[in-house]
Amino acid sequence: MKRQKNMLKKLAAALTVSLLGLVPATAQESGTADAPAAIEIKDFSLGSPDATVEVIEYASFTCPHCASFHAEVYPQLKADYIDTGKIRFTYREVYFDRYGLWAAMIARCGGEMRYFGIVDMIFAQQQEWAASDDPAVVVENLKRIGRTAGMDDATMDACMQDGAKAEAMVAHYQANSTADGLQGTPSFVIGGTLHSNMSYDEMKALIDAELAE
């Protein structure tokens, strides 16, 4: 267990270390404080909490196929099944690289009420915000999305500097992806079974079969 925790710390550090110097340090960092309590990372969901069928999406914010799913399939899925209360849709972030983790930190920074709106903007603007090889440019691009969502720079800088939360996010991702046998993105858990990327018609057939049971 101790070895696993050390590995998680190293992975989170590797993904966040490049943020040092890219966002201003917060005042909280200069003082001493008691050890923080364990950080619980929750999954965000849309749709009825009473729905009998849950669809879980695993996606990376830097994955082109994930962006395509959100542009081409997700709107119809949302209109037909999520907004109507037929299913509960849960989004789980996947961190293959530092940019994907940083995007998730910005999305979560807005809280539950803003989360999915920020997710939509991150995917819609993926080719723009993630195109640069300069990490500072990527951070500024993500903060621009955050500003559009109503966040100020001080709030976002504090979120981006939260290494303990980044570590907890990575641990949450690894635990879920291992439990579900994740192989790539986007992937979907429907009725407890993991599926790879698919068309709307393919997803509709799987969901309808679950609803009919």
Predicted regions and their residues:
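C-terminal cap of thioredoxin/glutaredoxin-like
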Residues: 2-12, 28, 60, 144-213
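Glycine-rich, flexible loop/turn motifs
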Residues: 42, 102, 156
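Structural alpha/beta surface segment adjacent to cysteine/selenocysteine redox centers
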Residues: 61, 67-147
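Extracytoplasmic thiol/disulfide redox context detector
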Residues: 2-97, 170-174, 212-213
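A short alpha-helix capping/helix-coil boundary motif
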Residues: 56-58, 120-123, 151-154
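Extracellular/periplasmic catalytic domains that process cell-envelope and extracellular macromolecules
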Residues: 49, 82-84, 114, 180-183
